[in-house]
Amino acid sequence: MRGLKAKEYETLEQLFKMKQGSLLKTMSYFLQSKYKTVKTTADYIYAIGDIPIALVAHMDTVFPKPVSELYYDIRKNVMWSPQGLGADDRAGIYAIIQILCSTNLRPHIIFTTDEERGGIGASVLAQENCPFPQLKYMIELDRQGKNDCVFYSCDNDDFVAYIESFGFIEDFGSFSDISILGPAWQVCSTNLSVGYENEHTYIETLNISALLNTIEKVKKMLQKESIPDFKYIEFSLSTKRWFQDLYNSNGAAGDNDFYVHCKKCKGLFSGYEVFPVKGLDGKTCFYCPDCIVENIEWCDNCGEPFEIDPNNPKKICNDCAGGLLECHSTSKKLKNNLMK
């Protein structure tokens, strides 16, 4: 498990402590030092690179003020703040900075404002024609968890399989900047996990191992000698792969409702009657009311439901299996430890 180096920690600390306006100016200067063509407005920044992939992240957080206290549990490799961390989406900003600073790779870059207020920056940018001369797909770095990839209205199975080949698993998602930009520009897009959990709450955490892992995976995508083209296909329930996998394989769709088989008893139930939960394989499964008690547990730490492993019964989900977070030092003391 690799932790943060001193300079990496300092970069993250600075990102967490900046307001959106200051971050916009800082990112504009940063991109101008790396790219020839950069456009900065009050709503977004973009830079035109030489790799036909765009990396996307948003500069705002849900919290009214930046953090003043920041803690890093070295043993568990997790960051948090009692003021609300704001890793959604400062973790995505950090990931892009690290990719540009540690390599000569120059993908297109998009930084947006006010994603948490409904994607205001992305909506303004979406009104323009795509500014990139070549753009094969977009990667947003703005997803909770460790290995999720979310596709929103993009419904190209070949694209899903390609992204999953780098070690991600398709999951559900409701909204992000690419859910606006992708359809507007007719470009395949995915949102990848950057390690934060419990976003939009004061117990938000950032798993550094997961963040660094995603950074390395994205580098591999950018380093491909041949980057494939993918046709943008609009989402529909009749063709969406997760619909086929989760409903047609485990149940049947009726004329007016979804019907799903309970994983345990195999009974057929309306989608409104069953309980969805992340299974042991990381994918969503369903249990009926009669089978919930024996097969689903609620984590004593985070409160989220998880499927019970009969061979390893426990009261804590896999994501929290390391135990509760512990603060071992102040940020000042931590910096000294990292410098050793």
Set out the residue ranges of the language-model regions.
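Zn-dependent metallopeptidase/amidohydrolase metal-coordination segment
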Residues: 53, 169-214
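Catalytic-core environment of secreted peptidases
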Residues: 45-87
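Short cysteine-rich clusters marking metal-coordination/redox-active sites
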Residues: 262-265, 288, 299-302, 317-320
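A non-catalytic alpha/beta surface segment that caps or lines the substrate-entry region
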Residues: 4-51
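Cysteine-rich micro-motifs
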Residues: 280-293, 312-323
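His/Asp/Glu-rich mid-to-C-terminal helical/loop segments that flank catalytic regions of hydrolases
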Residues: 198-256
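Cys/His-rich microdomains that often coordinate metals
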Residues: 267-270, 287, 295, 306, ...
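Acidic/histidine-rich catalytic neighborhood of metal-dependent amide-processing enzymes
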Residues: 62, 83-163, 170-172
